[in-house]
Amino acid sequence: GLGDVYKRQIKSELTNPKLAWMFENCFPNTLDTTVRYRKTDGKDDTVVYTGDIHAMWLRDSGAQVWPYVQLANQDPELKAMLAGVIRRQFKCINIDPYANAFLDPYDPNPDHQWMRDMTDMKEGLHERKWEIDSLCYPLRLAYHYWKTTGDISIFDEEWLCLLYTSPSPRD
């Protein structure tokens, strides 16, 4: 599976058996429980749920996959999943740069509990509670993914659109 070589390496370096067991079970947890990878229009597209809530927070999804960036060049599936997270984050920001959480567009039963919020809720949003880290985490992930892999394919039309839709000091 994803990151198996890395897991074995780290586990072999840990002398405490409980800590080794915890790492082996915790490290792949995001991949096993919250990642929803697919191809959309021939491009990698990954939604990362935040725990038990079937929605994707920009900050949390970036933090959840962050430990895997260092392994992207060792595993093509992991690299594709990460590229998909970045593309999905860019798409989300383009839906609404002031939102912080988004619904999975392929979820047949999305959770619309916040649609009555007194904000400009749009289709595809889970929550519209803007925080600056909602924009910082996707940029951090994209930058470090690019620096690690050299892959510029993530900087496509969604990226260009994001540059023009993101909040500016004039807003």
Q: What is the predicted function of each stretch?
A:
Residues H54-L82, I86-S166, R170:
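Aromatic-rich carbohydrate-recognition surfaces in CAZymes
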Residues D4-R59, G84:
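Low-complexity, Ser/Thr/Pro/Gly-enriched N-terminal "stalk/linker" regions
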Residues G1-Y6, P167-D171:
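Short, small-residue-biased leader/transition segments that mark boundaries at the very start
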